[in-house]
UniProtKB/Swiss-Prot annotation:
Region feature Disordered, mapped onto this chain: 1-30, 50-74, 108-131
Protein name: Coiled-coil domain-containing protein 188
Protein's membrane topology: Single-pass membrane protein
Listed transmembrane segments: 347-363
Gene Ontology CC: membrane
Entry-linked InterPro entries: SMCO2/5
Keyword Membrane: yes
Coiled coil: 154-189
Length: 402
């Protein structure tokens, strides 16, 4: 079982190693030194053969190997001033290194806690193991398991840095993709759809996470990164290579889509400029048409004015001509003949009236019985009676209506 979590020399909490009984094979020799603190939790359960070590830290300097120790005692808790200063200087340096890398816990398997430091990191791009070095009291040499754990620590450190870089690039790409989607949505409108994702890259969406608006959650506590760590434990380099290839494909797809969007944007800008030019041309044409219509109205008004003036002038000329021609005809023979014809017509009309009256009075008044009463009023009839009373006969009196 794991012990209580204490603050290790690297500045991070680690569960302590469980205690083991004192060794009696060497005749009261020293206990085995502590193999460090249990590290990376994503590697799953740690075997008892690798993780169960002595709980005691380092032995007190000067104690040597004389005399056995009792279980429950902790003589290694009292350290000399030199070892304490060395450990204090070593701890902040490792803590600063881990803080620079951005990880919340030491990333090395629990079975490899006792790898000693040999002059810094193993290679370029790898981070050193944050656990304290092993004590080689009594001339004990490091086992092959320690060397293997040191190599795995270096590989895991480089892989973690690669995954951290991949995740940061993925996050930046998704942020750029979100911005491009917003721009494309504003460009296309509410009824349009976005371009679908490439079918070979649709499996990469499982590694994405929603953008954190606050941005306070560290990268090490995110679920996709823990999933990548578990997959890293199973297949390290192959998975890293596959991720790099997929990232390269995503970049290429992103560049292609970006070029297509840029072309579409250029075409839209050209269409917008063309529409603006057409609108300007239509406005100018409208102004020209209005000017032409105004000119046509002015021309029509001038034509009507000229026609009216011509008609008035012609009428005046005709009147003047008729007046100048009619004056010398008054004293001519044509005027005398006209007067004679007028006198003749008057005589004929008088004779017709006299003949009609004689016919009605003497011969037959029947045709005029229905015509004369409506034409003559009562007063006219009485006047006619008074005028014709000396000449009236019975027949004529019956003809009159009153």
């Amino acid at each position: 079982m794991e012990g209580l979590k204490t603050l290790g020399p690297c500045g991070h909490p680690h569960p302590q190693c469980p205690p083991t009984p004192a060794s009696s094979s060497h005749g009261g020799g020293l206990d085995q030194p502590c193999q460090g603190f249990v590290g990376w939790p994503c590697l799953g359960p740690i075997s008892s053969a690798h993780s169960v070590q002595s709980q005691r830290p380092f032995p007190v300097p000067g104690a040597g190997g004389s005399g056995p120790t009792v279980e429950g005692e902790a003589p290694g808790l009292f350290l000399s001033s030199q070892e304490q200063r060395a450990r204090d200087t070593e701890g902040p340096r490792q803590g600063d290194l881990e803080a620079g890398l951005g990880w919340g816990w030491p990333l090395h398997p629990g079975s490899n806690q006792g790898a000693p430091r040999q002059g810094g990191s193993i290679g370029s791009g790898t981070r050193p193991c944050p656990c304290p070095p092993l004590s080689r009291e009594g001339g004990a040499l490091a086992s092959p398991r320690v060397a293997l754990s040191q190599l795995q620590c270096g590989l895991l450190g480089s892989a973690e840095q690669s995954f951290l870089q991949l995740e940061q690039e993925n996050h930046s790409l998704k942020r750029q993709n979100q911005e491009l989607r917003e721009q494309l949505g504003a460009l296309l409108g509410p009824g349009q759809q976005f371009l679908p994702l490439c079918p070979e890259h649709s499996s990469c969406t499982a590694l994405a996470w929603p953008p954190d608006p606050a941005g306070t959650q560290p990268l090490g506590n995110r679920a996709p990164l823990q999933l990548l760590r578990r997959e890293l434990c199973q297949g390290q380099e192959a998975f890293v290579q596959q991720s790099q290839n997929e990232l390269q494909q995503i970049r290429l797809c992103f560049e292609r889509k970006k070029m297509v969007i840029t072309e579409v944007w250029d075409n839209v800008a050209e269409m917008h400029m063309a529409l603006n030019n057409q609108a300007t041309g239509l406005l100018n044409l409208k102004k020209d048409i209005r000017g032409v219509l105004d000119q046509m109205e002015d021309i029509q008004l001038e034509i009507l004015r000229e026609r009216a003036q011509c008609r008035t002038r012609a009428r005046k000329e005709k009147q003047m001509a008729s007046m100048s021609k009619g004056r010398p005809k008054l004293g001519s023979s044509k005027g005398l003949a006209g007067q004679l014809w007028l006198l003749t017509l008057r005589l004929l009309l008088g004779a017709l009236l006299v003949w009609t009256a004689a016919y009605v009075y003497v011969v037959n008044p029947t045709p005029f019985e229905g015509l004369v009463p409506p034409l003559l009023s009562r007063a006219t009839v009485w006047k006619l009676r008074a005028l014709l009373d000396p000449f009236l006969r019975l027949k004529v009196d019956g003809f009159l209506p009153f």
